[in-house]
Each structure stands twice: as C-alpha cells, then as structure tokens.
Amino acid sequence: MRKITIRALLLCSLLLVFHTSAAAELQAQEGHLMIPGDTDTALETVDDERFFECTFECDIKKEGKPCKPKGCKCDDKDNKDHKKCSGGWRCKLKLCLKF
C-alpha cells in the first residue's frame, strides 16, 4: 500500500511541476501577443486593400483573363507566377501571400 501511495504522490508532484512550468511559459508568451486595439488602423486598412487587390488579381488570373489592378505590377505578362503586388504581396498557387 505504501508503494502505491508514494507513486501517486510522485505522479501528482510531477504533474504539478509540469503544469506550473507550462503556465509560466504561457504567461511569458502573453507579453509578446499583439492586442488588436493597439495596432495602427491605417496600416491595417492598407494591408486589407492590398489583400483584396491581390485576391482579385488571383481570381482574374484563374479565369485566364489579363489583369493589372491598382497597386499591382506585372513583370512578365506571359508568366503568371511572377506577377507581384506592391507591399510584399505575391500570387502563388492561386493564393495571395504576404512576404
């Protein structure tokens, strides 16, 4: 009976140590999280507009029609994979990604 009690106590203490260390790590990470109210809304608006433009570009490109929406530059009209948008947005695999 003693062995079972000792094992149970050791297991509980290990779980407590693991839980405490995980909670401390999570608390440390919370300091690095961005709070939505603290961001610059003007910058978010510009990024949203660029994302919309690039999504629009990818949709048109998917249909096979030529396109050059506002803010997007086309290096090579024949090569669809090299079409880039200003601000770090690129069309890749019919998706728009920010680099």
From Swiss-Prot:
Family: Belongs to the neurotoxin 12 (Hwtx-2) family. 04 (lasiotoxin) subfamily.
Residue pairs linked by disulfide bridges in the UniProt entry: 54-67, 58-91, 72-74, 85-96
Protein name: U1-theraphotoxin-Lsp1c
Record bears the keyword Translocase: no
Propeptide residues according to the Swiss-Prot or TrEMBL record: 24-50
InterPro entries registered for this protein in UniProt: Hwtx-2-like (IPR012625)
Species for this entry: Lasiodora sp. (strain IBSP 8539)
Disulfide bond recorded as keyword: yes
